[in-house]
Amino acid sequence: MNENMTGYPSIDKPWLKYYSEEAIHSPLPDGSMYDYMTACNEERMNEPALNYFGRKITHRKLQTEIDRCARALSACGVKAGDVVSLCLLAIPEAVYLLYAVNKLGAVANFLVLNATPQELHEQIIAAKSKVVITVDLAEKQITEAVKDSCAEQVISVSLAQSMPTVTAVLFRMKAKPAPTTLTSWNSFMEAGKNVDAIYPANTKESAAVIEYTGGTTGKAKGVVISNGAANSVAFQYKCTNGHLLFSKGEKFLDILPPFYAYGIFVGIHTPLCNCLENVLIPDPSPQNFPRVLLKYRAQHFTGGPLHLNKLVEYARHRHVDLSFVKTAAFGGDGMSEEWKASTTDFLKSHRAKCGIVTGYGMTETAGTFCTSTCQSTQMIPFARNNIKVRDIDTEQELLCEQEGEICVSGPSLMTTYLNHPKETDEVMWAEDHTRWLRTGDLGYVSKDGYLIITGRIKRILWAMSGDVVYRVYPMAIEKVISSHAAVKQCAVVGKADGERGYLVVAYVVPHRNDEWPQVQEELAELCRKELPETSWPYVYHPMDKLPTTPAGKVDFRALERMAAEES
């Protein structure tokens, strides 16, 4: 080790060797999300910003629609500091509204479309939203959610609103939308026609967006993200030292809904600030992914493992040329090292210019905090971010290669949990004028500066063997089970066993159900071979699919309830 190195990742920052001096020291953007997006494209006004079902929307048109939306919102009484609740998919109106709300100095509260009406009701009240705008698909839930709430105006927008004319007619004929009692989009826009909007000075410290946590291990919380945090993500994607190869005018396929933090900050804001043409796909289903990717031939795309799995399935029986692909970025549950390797092989065998690009982040870090490169699936923090690893018992900082809780700092950290100061204080602290966030994830930083995630603290179980208490790590068990060729997906939870701690319960999605008896025996043998006795599952349950949260993540709470109900 270099004599000037301390061994502590937060001091040595070994990942900085992968970045240029410009990436490390360039000033971060000031102002609002709207300000930064506009500044990045001020010389590209006639270039396409958005692509929706083949209809291209230039930056000039985008600016016009943002201003029209801002006037319409002003007609509804929206002003600086107000919160506008949006329940939308990846459609042009979501982009217009994001930046219009931001330009007014207000806050965009993105509601999860498949949340329950009660959850939506609570989120609207917590944000004190007087204006709610929903896509027509969610009208039923929103109509129920706004009852006895603070919402005074509720507007509905159709998925077909910005489609090309013929496509829109065919869509409406097929969809047969029910009559609405909500204010239509056209009426909303008409009301702002002669209104003068007031655009206040907007700072990087001002709140810009509220997004909601995934709720995999607890109730979803609203996360307040500032302008500066949002802009730092887009800016740092520009400064990856060529690890990600963006060129002006290339296409970015946006298939993730804006109610995911990743969908807003990486799916909308980052492509626009990097001068890419954003292809908006309102149907986020994995089944739709292969068709739209090959139709638009987008050089850059992002999604979850299920999206790429569908592409792999699609390509089994067809000739698929992916030579146009330059960035295939994925995050979320189910990304084992074996999966990363096999999907990278798939991409390269179909002539893609990259393998899998993986990221690490959370809603509290504006979606992403680390990224890998096109050459490796190992993740490095962005240049302006920092990481320390702390012992989960003593909270003492650990050295490189030592496993503990991952704690992060940097410009993309959230401001607060909405209306939850106690929970905010539990995960954030200040040290030497630097704000730090506890991620709840286990891992370590390698001597080469790579971040390795090994587990989730909230999911750690304990078990007794003799008189000794042992920690049990579900992710380690999942890794072993997932290594079996017959396993498509798995999740491990604990079942309370009194003073003995927890029994390990494994839920497994096999590739073929008819092979399950043999697979179950082989999994038991594999776990006995690879894991300590306290980590052996006492039961293996086959499933057609694992339950998921509204955010699309594995719902471990649902699995824990299932395990608890077993006799």
What function would you assign to each model-found segment?
Residues 73-79, 192-206, 210-254, 348:
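Conserved adenylate-forming
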Residues 157, 531-554:
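AMP-binding/adenylate-forming catalytic domain of the ANL superfamily
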Residues 299-302, 314-377, 386:
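Gly/Ser/Thr-rich phosphate-binding loop
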Residues 55-57, 70-118, 255-257, 510:
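Conserved AMP-binding/adenylate-forming
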Residues 94, 115, 122, 132-134, ...:
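AMP-binding/adenylate-forming catalytic core of the ANL superfamily
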Residues 231-251, 259-302, 306, 310, ...:
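Conserved AMP-binding/adenylation subdomain of ANL enzymes
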Residues 1-57, 61-76, 161-177, 201, ...:
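N-lobe entry segment of adenylate-forming
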Residues 380-384, 396-428, 450, 456, ...:
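Conserved ATP/PPi-binding loop(s) of AMP-dependent carboxylate-activating enzymes
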